[in-house]
From Swiss-Prot:
Gene Ontology cellular-component terms listed: endoplasmic reticulum membrane; membrane
Cytoplasmic-side positions: 43-49, 113-175, 221-247
Organism: Xenopus laevis
Name recorded for this polypeptide: Dual oxidase maturation factor 1
Principal place of residence: membrane
Keywords, in A-Z order: Glycoprotein, Membrane, Protein transport, Transmembrane, Transmembrane helix, Transport
Amino acid sequence: MQANIFPFYPQPRTPFKFDTKIIEIIIICIVTACTFIIILPGIRGKSRSIWLLRILTSLFIGAVILAVNFTSDWEMGTITATTVYKSFSHSMLNASIGLWIGLKGLNITLIGNPEYQLNETINYNEEFAWESANQFETSYKDALERGLPFPIVYVAEKFTISSDCGLFQQYCISTYYSSGIMWIAFCSWILYNVLFSMPVILYGIYMMFVTAICMLVSLISFASVRKAPVCNIQFGNSILKTHFGVSYWLSLITGLLCLIISLVLLFLYKTQPKVLQLIFSYGEEEDLSNKSENEEEHSSVLSLNEIL
């Protein structure tokens, strides 16, 4: 390739902004929450606010479980370095290089400092999925054919199967099990919501506990990859280091919240069953029915006394 002649995209490049799947999940949860808020005035009794809190908490847990399966910030890292812009070229570029790892693959970002350099806007975000080894290798070969900037190709090469780093095997296995266990957590989330809607509270509590355990086990599976030897991704004297991202910590907080709630509900079931019935709107209806029956019996007794 001749100097200063770079391949370019056949169409204008649009950098990655938001994942449409995440937006769809957020919209569905917001619409569902608004629906429950609208019907809230039609609910009788003092347990109205408790019912709304229970619904919103359950929606939050379900939304997190579903969303983190598609996010790309379980592990992340950025570095600012001066590096070669294109392969087989002497043009240097000062840019911020980012690595974003999720359960479905990774994203590599490249943003120039400033953005406009070398007569073009440097703002890349390339996705490399690893749902299968062939898919990742195909994405990597496509990146080479398209002539992507050297930093993106260099980082992606570290995750290929043929690389000596072994990052693909480490991350692919850990994310495979993490994603699978997280989907089991989502299934158990659906089950405990169904069980809570029926008078089988104890089984619902058990399934909520299973949901929490599955989330925590999924996090442990993902974190286990950091115990393996790390292959350095180096740009000059700087090393691109990663750390746990927003999705990891959000999943951890949600899993602990789900665990605490299940243990509290189990404690109430053993010690204060009436309080638990009030939370799930069971006790109030029973008390009202008993009260109406007592009033009918009392009125019938009074009528008999008047006749006598």
